[in-house]
Amino acid sequence: MIKISAILILSFVCSITSWAQQPKLVPHPIHLKNGKQFSLNLPANFEIIPAAEGLKRVRFFAQAPDRRMFVTDMYDLTDNKKGTVYILDDWNADTGKFGKIIPYLTGLRNPNSVQFYTDAQGQDWLYLAETHQLTRQKFSRGETQPSSKAEVLATFPDYGLSYKYGGWHLTRTIAIGGNGKIYVSVGSSCNACVEKEKVRASVIEMNPDGSEQRIYATGLRNAVGLKWIGRFLFATNQGSDHLGRKKPDETFYALKQDVDYGWPACYSWQGKVLADPKFKRASGCKNIPSPYTYFPSHSSALGFDYFDDPHTDSTIKNAFLVALHGSTDEAIGHGYQIAMMRKGQKLETFMDGFLVGKKVYGRPADIYKIDEKSFYFSDDRAGVIYYVREK
């Protein structure tokens, strides 16, 4: 096995990393407080613990400046104003459980993402992405409810699910850039169409105060996973639904400024960019970049994190773990797992068992690396946050 110096870590992430083989997965019994019992399959040298239960459509994580974990909850699949941002508090590393789940913000419209930023003056800010807007508010360390009023930094198309052009994709995702910028992904209004608003199917960039807003990247049908790692802004992207069960790929990109990633006229299949015959594009698809990597069609790639610590177990070292939420149609059966991805290598499975036959036990949504030996992931079907650690 080729080993990579820790000094190179993320600056080297776009080149070949250590070669690995599909790890053997073994059943790990899961017993939830609501009485449900099943098994999730993962490597034998890891254990999995339900760290928080009783949530609804729990989604994306962020760690506050005071080290507490925050997580969003969209409540259900409807366009609603019942969403919540929770504080996951009183963490016990021995038991792998949170002692308290505290509602921090309530009555929110489909909150998918929350992030924190500390400005040059040392002021902490909480950023919240709802369907219709991006807001920020001052954050005081240790607080259990907001201490200041939110200010609106940006507004987004908010036609909901009844929009005449389709009404798709209610989520917005925030990433804090290592360059001091704020990024927000806005999904398309449709399965495949020519959009009426430029902000749709894009990632936008702005200053922390909301000024100098611009389109950063386009042609991204729904970039739900968005995270700045090292020197790169990475994104997962969901492909169109009308090209059959085997096409197109779900894709993963290291985004570049002012690049068009092709949707709706171009799509990826087995990593190659092809033209969608439904749409005519004067320039064709020859200048559309191929993805960093790709996932099975309709597997719904969402949140992810990168495991680069020199002391990380070799199973996941120098790999991305990606939550494949799963196809809406369970009969397709793609996704429903945590995938393990290294550039230039075959996709591997770190965890599965969320779908057994026609029975759905969960749908992973986001992954958050805690340290070199452990991570959290959210399950928005069961309303559970899991803790996974090396034994």
Question: What would you call each of these model-derived segments?
Answer:
Residues 51-54, 103-109, 154-158, 162-166, ...:
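Surface loop/turn motifs at the tips and blade-to-blade linkers of beta-strand repeat domains
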Residues 68-72, 122-128, 181-185, 232-236, ...:
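Conserved beta-propeller blade signature
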Residues 81-119:
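Blade-loop segments of beta-propeller domains
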